[in-house]
UniProtKB/Swiss-Prot annotation:
The chain crosses the membrane at residues 35-55. F(1)F(0) ATP synthase produces ATP from ADP in the presence of a proton or sodium gradient. F-type ATPases consist of two structural domains, F(1) containing the extramembraneous catalytic core and F(0) containing the membrane proton channel, linked together by a central stalk and a peripheral stalk. During catalysis, ATP synthesis in the catalytic domain of F(1) is coupled via a rotary mechanism of the central stalk subunits to proton translocation. One of its GO terms (cellular component) is plasma membrane. The keyword Cell membrane applies. Pfam families: ATP-synt_B. It comes from the Bacteria. It is a single-pass membrane protein. The keyword GTP-binding does not apply. F-type ATPases have 2 components, F(1) - the catalytic core - and F(0) - the membrane proton channel. F(1) has five subunits: alpha(3), beta(3), gamma(1), delta(1), epsilon(1). F(0) has three main subunits: a(1), b(2) and c(10-14). The alpha and beta chains form an alternating ring which encloses part of the gamma chain. F(1) is attached to F(0) by a central stalk formed by the gamma and epsilon chains, while a peripheral stalk is formed by the delta and b chains. It comes from Mycoplasmopsis synoviae (strain 53) (Mycoplasma synoviae). Belongs to the ATPase B chain family. This is ATP synthase subunit b.
Amino acid sequence: MSSSVQVLSETIEIGKVVTASDEIAKRFNNLFPSIPMMLATFIAFVIVFLLLFFFLYNPVKKMIRKRQEFIQSQIDDSIKAKEDSLAKLSQAQAELIESHKQSVNIVNNAKSKAQEILASYKNKAISDANRLIEETQIDLNERKKEFDKNSRILIAETATEIAQRILKREISKSTQDEIIKDFLEDKTPIEDI
């Protein structure tokens, strides 16, 4: 009711007398556009659609396809880079394990070499000590023989002097040398004399 009053008030303002049924019919006719207008709108829509399709949709679709290809190539590159990095990581780990084995071998070889050198120096020191002991023993034996010889000479000379005094006669040099020679050739140890 309020709309019909409003319609009436509009018609009164304009100065024309319009009935409510005329107004409703006019509005009802305005709901359906005219066929030429509808056809022109449809043709304009088709033209705009085709223009948008060829000038906007296809380039956008190509750009989207290129973007998808770029993204896919980036994904493929990242997958390949990941695989490469995993391969390099496993290779580095294998090299680390190998270098660890080599370092253990080097340490073990160094230990065994050090033990061999230590044993060599120990054996050399023992042989040098034994050689020194033998040389010292030989030297002691030679000195003992020298001492025994000198002692025999001294004893022979002393005995000759004592014999001369006892006999109060002079022994000739040849007799003295003969007695000393016999005494020196005697192999009886000094302790037994």
